[in-house]
Regions:
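N-terminal, active-site-proximal structural segment of metallo-dependent hydrolase catalytic domains
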Residues: 1-73, 80-83, 88, 243
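Active-site beta-strand/loop signature of hydrolases that rely on acidic residues for catalysis
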Residues: 2-7, 36-61, 135-138, 154-181, ...
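Active-site environment of divalent metal-dependent phosphoester hydrolases
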Residues: 11-12, 56-59, 86-88, 143-146, ...
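Residue-level detector of structured alpha->beta connecting loops
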Residues: 45, 75, 106-108, 162, ...
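Structured beta-strand-rich core segments of catalytic domains in phosphoester-bond hydrolases
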Residues: 53-132, 224-227
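Charged helix-capping and loop-helix junction motifs
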Residues: 63-68, 149-155
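Metal-dependent phosphoester-hydrolase catalytic domains
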Residues: 114, 129, 156-166, 171-243
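Metal-dependent phosphoester/phosphodiester hydrolase catalytic core
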Residues: 128-133, 138-145
Length: 243
């Protein structure tokens, strides 16, 4: 079975413009670029896909939902959720309120839950069960102290799971991978990326921000950090078996 993790940066591509690169790139149209991302995903032939930073219908996409488009392009079931809770002040802003994360699967998504952590701006956790495995898709805060609080709460979610499990996403471990090691030890999780290949930025990878962690009843057969410039992050593709 194959699982692909990819922070797609709302389909706006990597930083292409030197001046005001972050703002102009963030606001860029993404309708054409999302087609390239869909074709890339299709070529990898994953069974399950975890997508971080998905545009769910802002002006960048002319109100079209990237999760729906990618599910159609890859012929998969899908589930998505907005990053911010309904009563959050961030939901008042036109672009921000259409930002979210999504999961695609070639099999039925039999259960799903949306968890919002207590701290931070980035605090959505999507939990699904599909293909005999439970997936937790995360995108953690940029602030280190906030991340530490989020790790504690994330652990309280995963410790209740007694099924084969993958915890994957953009953990934003800007302080280094050491900050995730205590969480992994407490949760009895291993990283699929044993060589600690960096995933950010895509054009000159220096930091390992994206992780695919797994429980002991999952055996990793192969892992690839794929070099592609479709986003500012590199995708991770794993081949695994449930044992």
């Amino acid at each position: 079975m194959k699982f692909l993790l990819y922070n797609i940066r709302y389909g706006t591509g990597k930083y292409l413009i030197k001046r005001f690169k972050h703002i102009r790139g963030y606001l860029g149209r993404s309708e054409k670029h999302i087609d390239r991302i869909g074709k890339f995903i299709r070529r990898q032939k994953p069974d399950i896909v975890g997508l971080v930073e998905v545009d769910l219908g802002s002006f960048r996409m002319k109100s079209k939902n990237q999760a729906e488009i990618l599910s159609e392009m890859t012929d998969k079931n899908f589930i998505y959720q907005y990053k911010y809770e309904e009563n959050s002040r961030y939901m008042k802003f036109p672009i921000v309120r259409k930002q979210g994360n999504a999961l695609l699967s070639n099999k039925e998504i039999v259960n799903h839950k949306f968890h919002y952590l207590d701290n931070g701006m980035k605090k959505l956790i999507i939990e699904i069960e599909t293909n005999g495995v439970v997936i937790f898709l995360v995108h953690l805060a940029l602030g280190g102290k906030t991340r530490m609080k989020q790790f504690v709460q994330l652990f309280s979610l995963i410790e209740k799971c007694d099924k084969p499990m993958i915890v994957a996403g953009d953990f934003n471990t800007l302080w280094g991978t050491e900050e995730i090691e205590l969480f992994m030890k407490a949760g009895k999780l291993k990283s699929a990326n044993l060589e600690r290949k960096p995933t950010f930025p895509s054009w000159s990878p220096k930091k390992e921000l994206d992780f695919v962690l797994h429980s002991k009843n999952i055996k990793i057969n192969d892992v690839k950090v794929i070099k592609t410039m479709l986003s500012d992050h590199l995708p991770i593709l794993i081949d695994f078996d449930i044992i």
